[in-house]
Amino acid sequence: MAFHVMIIPSMNCPSDCSYCWGVDRDSRVMDMETVREMVSWLMEFRNEPATFTFHGGEPLLAGYEFYRDTLKLISERLSFLKPAFAIQTNLWLMTDEMAELFAEYSIPIGSSLDGPREINDYQRGDGYFDRTMQGYEIARKHGLRVSFISTFTSYSIRRREEIFNFFLENGMNLKLHPALPSLKSSDPEEWAITAEEYGDLLLYLLDSYLEHFGEIEIQNIDHFAKSAFLRRGLYVHMLIVWATPSQLTPTVIYTHAIASLV
C-alpha cells in the first residue's frame, strides 16, 4: 500500500482565484512543535518508503526557516522511511535561497497556471501570471523540475486549443483539473464544468498529445496509459494529512484521506 503524508503548513494563500473554495484567510502557519509531534508519531506508525508533500493553501507562507528545519528533521529522524519530498505552490514566494534548499533535497514542484496571461489572470486574478512565471524562472535556474496544474472552467474550456498550445510552445508539462462546484459561492456552478465537457476535453487533449508525442507531457493521460498497461492504478491508496485543527477543509476531505490532526 502506498504511503503518502500530506503536510499543510497553512490554508491561507496570497492569491485570490475566482473558482477556489479551499482557502482559509484566518489560517495560522504551522509551528515546529507540530512538525516534531508528527515525526514522533510517524516513528511508531509504519516502516516503508514514504513521500511527504507540502500543500495548502500556499505552503511557502511558512518561510525558508520552516522548510530548512522540517526537511532536516524528517530526513534525519525518519531516514528509515527513505523520505521523498514534493510541494504544490503558486511560486509567488519562491526565492533563490528557497530554491537552493529544494534542490538539495531534489524536491519536484507542482504549480498552477491556467494558460496564457489573459486567460489565466481572468480566472486567477490580475498579476497572477507574472508572479508565478517569475517564481518559475527562479526554480528552473536552480534545476528544479516544475509541472503545472491547469484548471479548466466553464470559461477556459472554450479556449482549450490556446491553452494546450501555450504549454506546448513553452515546454511546460501539464496536468488538468476540472473546476468543481463551489461549496462557498452563492452560484456554485458558475465556474464548474460537467462530466461530459471534461470527457470531451480529455479526448481533445489525447488527440493533441498523440500529434505532438514526445514534445509535451500531460500527466492525466500518462497515468491512464500506465494504468492500462501495468494493470494497476497510480493513485494514492493511503494518505495521512497533518495539519492544525482548523485546516481540515472540504479540499482535504475530498481526497478520501485518513486524516490525523493535532
From Swiss-Prot:
InterPro entries: Aldolase_TIM, CHP04083_rSAM, Elp3/MiaA/NifB-like_rSAM, rSAM, Sulphatase_maturase_rSAM. SUPFAM superfamilies: Radical SAM enzymes. Residues 1-211 form the Radical SAM core domain. Keywords: 4Fe-4S, Iron, Iron-sulfur, Metal-binding, S-adenosyl-L-methionine. [4Fe-4S] cluster binds at residues 13, 17, 20. One of its GO terms (molecular function) is metal ion binding. PROSITE patterns: RADICAL_SAM. Its cofactor is [4Fe-4S] cluster. Pfam families: Radical_SAM (PF04055). SMART domains: Elp3. Belongs to the radical SAM superfamily. Anaerobic sulfatase-maturating enzyme family. PANTHER family: ANAEROBIC SULFATASE-MATURATING ENZYME HOMOLOG ASLB-RELATED. This is Uncharacterized protein MTH_114. It comes from Methanothermobacter thermautotrophicus (strain ATCC 29096 / DSM 1053 / JCM 10044 / NBRC 100330 / Delta H).
